[in-house]
Amino acid sequence: MEFDAVILSGGRSSRLGGVPKSGLMHDGATLLERALQAAQGAAAIAVVGPDPGTLPEGVLSCREDPPFAGPAAAIAAGLTALERHRGPDGRRRPVSPFTLVLACDMPRAGDAVRTLLEAARGEHPGGGLMAVAADGRRQPLVGLYSTAELQRCVTEAGQRGTLENASVFALLASLEVREVNVPGGSTDDVDTWDDASALGVTVPPGSHGRNSHEPVTRPGSPRQNSTLEANGEEPG
C-alpha cells in the first residue's frame, strides 16, 4: 500500500530534563532512527521538530509553527511539507493516499506499524487505522490515516483557530477510524527516566543527561503509555 509518513520529533522533554528524545539510544540507534526504520516503505517522509541533524537522503525536515505548538500543529506542518515536496525533476509529487503518523519516542513502534499495514492490506482502512495497546489504550500517534481526511481535519481546525496546542484526539474527532490491536509493548514510549530504563533506552555517550547506568526503575512499578499525556492529551 502506498503511504507517506509524518514523524513527530518535537516536544520539550520536560520530564527528561530537556534531553531531546529523538537523540536517545536503543539497541545502537537513536529513537529518531528507530522511527525512520519503522516508516520504511513510505513514499516520502517528513520529520517535524527541532533540527534533526543529518537525515537520510530524501527525508524532509520541517517545524511546527510556532515551535512547541503541540502534536496537532506538528501533523499540520508535516502534511504541508509533504504536499510541497518536489521530486528530483523539480515537479511537485502527488501525496500518497494514506499517511502514517508516528511519534519518535516509541522504540518498538516498528511492530505496531507493521501490524497496521497488514490490517490495511486485509481490509480497506477507510478514514484510517489507529493502534490500540494491549491494555486497551488508544494511541493516535501510531496511526495510518487517509491523507485527504487528515488534511480535512487540519483545515477545519485551522479555520476554527483550534490547531495550536490541540490534542490529536480533538484533531481527529470527526475522522472515522478503525482501531487495531498491536503487539504488546510496541507503543510503550519514553516520557521519564524510569520509562527509558524499562525500555533499555540510554543517553548517547558523551552527551549531557542522566547517567544511563544509574538504576532508575522501581521494582514492580507499572509501565504507562504516556505519549498522549506528554502531549497534553487525555488518554483514550
Model-derived features with residue positions:
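Conserved alpha/beta core of the MobA/IspD/sugar-nucleotide pyrophosphorylase nucleotidyltransferase superfamily
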Residues: 1, 164-236
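Nucleotide and nucleotide-moiety/phosphate-recognizing core
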Residues: 2-186, 193-194
